[in-house]
Regions:
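Conserved class I S-adenosyl-L-methionine
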Residues: 2-61
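A short His-aromatic
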Residues: 124-126
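Conserved beta-strand signature within the Rossmann-like core of class I S-adenosyl-L-methionine
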Residues: 146-153
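A short acidic, Gly/Pro-enriched loop at the edge of an enzyme's catalytic core
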Residues: 108-115
């Protein structure tokens, strides 16, 4: 939200514009997903890497905020997404949760996190190996020492 970062543009796939038009249907299309259970698995992974208890959690490519809906119950959360329309839905779902419009490759927040997650194959929208390296470096920049990045291919 205001002042947390300098948004930029990055090398994500121009096909991401498809999500702008689909935003209002996105949750219905993905209704088959069990976000609560997936979130429990994410928390188990984070704990297995020594991140017990309440953590600062950044969800990159957060979409409509379905994982954040469960993560915020036990963690301090922030979401980043490149779609204004997805974030509009997420803001209705997640009042009070900071949500930032930015590209996963170039976002800059003024804080670090214990966990950075990037789920639902969002990383696959990057176009080159260099884009992937740069994006992972960006994730690392936003992690506290000993922090964990959880990326779903």
């Amino acid at each position: 939200m205001g002042g947390e970062m300098g948004a930029g543009t990055g090398p994500t796939d121009p096909g991401l514009s498809q999500f702008h038009g689909l935003a209002k249907y996105y949750d219905a299309i993905n209704d088959w997903k069990d976000y609560r259970r997936e979130t429990e698995r994410l928390e188990t992974i984070a704990r297995s890497f020594g991140r017990p208890g309440r953590t600062a959690w950044l969800d990159v490519a957060c979409g409509t905020g379905r994982h954040l809906e469960f993560l915020r119950r036990r963690h301090t959360t922030v979401g980043v997404d490149g779609s204004r329309e997805m974030l509009r839905i997420a803001r209705r779902r997640l009042p009070g949760v900071p949500l930032v419009l930015a590209d996963m490759h170039t976002f800059r927040l003024k804080r670090r996190f214990d966990v950075v997650s990037c789920l639902f194959s969002a990383i696959g929208h990057l176009r080159t190996k260099e884009d992937v390296r740069t994006t992972f470096a960006n994730f690392a920049r936003h992690l506290n020492p000993g922090g964990v990045a959880i990326v779903e291919p």
